[in-house]
Amino acid sequence: MSLKGKKITVHDMTLRDGMHPKRHQMTLEQMKSVATGLDAAGVPLIEVTHGDGLGGSSVNYGFPAHTDEEYLSTVIPLMKQAKVSALLLPGIGTVDHLKMAHELGVSTIRVATHCTEADVSEQHIAMARKMGMDTVGFLMMAHMYSAEGLVKQAKLMEGYGANCIYITDSAGYMLPDDVKERLSAVRQALKPETELGFHGHHNLAMGIANSLAAVEVGANRIDAAAAGLGAGAGNTPMEVLVAVCARMGIETGVDVFKIQDVAEDLVVPLMDFPIRIDRDALTLGYAGVYGSFLLFAKRAEAKYGIPARELLLELGRRGMVGGQEDMIEDTALTMVRERQKLGHKVAVAA
């Protein structure tokens, strides 16, 4: 596999996907510190919002320490070369949120839907293109759909005006062959000028391998996070990705040592717990469960005595997807009742 001479855009997730393990409680000072470090390291694109995107502040997803407006207006003026992106999930974020982000200086908007529901993105993608934004269609939980199905969804988003399509391994479930099959099919179906991206999670330790597989079949935008800070076992660790790319001759424009220092000196100290592949994060990848479900499952374990691993396996069996966070507690309660019927003791917290 020779990828020498290829150029990719590394897109940072530390300040957006990294909000999940922080329970959306990053301070403005932490945002400023990490963002300026990433900018100085040469990272060209940095995503900044609530973990669930613009408008994510809610009972269902969690209330952040600050509003999206505060985070964006704090970070954007400090950037010397990096551009700032925002995530938007139709049904959570609105056109008004999109306009707010544009007015604050967000250059890239990523409109995210479940991998079978691209049709709900039409209004937001069309509006973003009308405003002249770099507009990305972001197909989540892509392991749950065939390559042929993803092609149809990607073509819809491209037709609405998206100039880049992302195939997103939200559960960290895919293996390199899965990535190649899906992304190569989508790459062949899209217009040559439409860019292709990949967003990975490290639940099966496949973040780097999957990202390289994506580049091999034509992806030129790759998501990663410093020290892997993100949902589950985290995103593809950026400092490792950049070092591997340097070894392989893939051009990222990111300084190998500066991004290591950002990860080690700025991101690791702000972690509330180590981002690693523990048994529950591994279960996310093994069972194909949405990454941000992890902390919800751990909280349900503490409350109802149902092991998080067993709960995650059940959520995977039921095919739960992002947006169904409220069903995690419901599923835990159902499992408690079923066990009590069978005479099993379940320790429910008062």
From Swiss-Prot:
Keyword Lyase set for record: yes
Ranges for domain Pyruvate carboxyltransferase: 8-260
Cited PROSITE patterns: PYR_CT (PS50991)
Residues the record lists as binding Mn(2+): 17, 199, 201
Enzyme class: lyase
Active site per the UniProt annotation: 20 (proton acceptor)
Catalytic activity: (S)-4-hydroxy-2-oxopentanoate = acetaldehyde + pyruvate
InterPro entries in the record: 2-IPM_HCS-like (IPR050073), 4OH_2_O-val_aldolase (IPR017629), Aldolase_TIM (IPR013785), DmpG_comm (IPR012425), DRE_TIM_HOA (IPR035685), PYR_CT (IPR000891)
Keyword terms of this UniProt record: Aromatic hydrocarbons catabolism, Lyase, Manganese, Metal-binding
UniProt GO MF annotations: 2-isopropylmalate synthase activity; 4-hydroxy-2-oxovalerate aldolase activity; manganese ion binding
Transmembrane segments: none
Site (Transition state stabilizer): 16
Positions bound to substrate: 16-17, 170, 199, 290
Family (UniProt): Belongs to the 4-hydroxy-2-oxovalerate aldolase family.
Protein name per UniProt: 4-hydroxy-2-oxovalerate aldolase 2
Species in which this protein is naturally found: Comamonas testosteroni
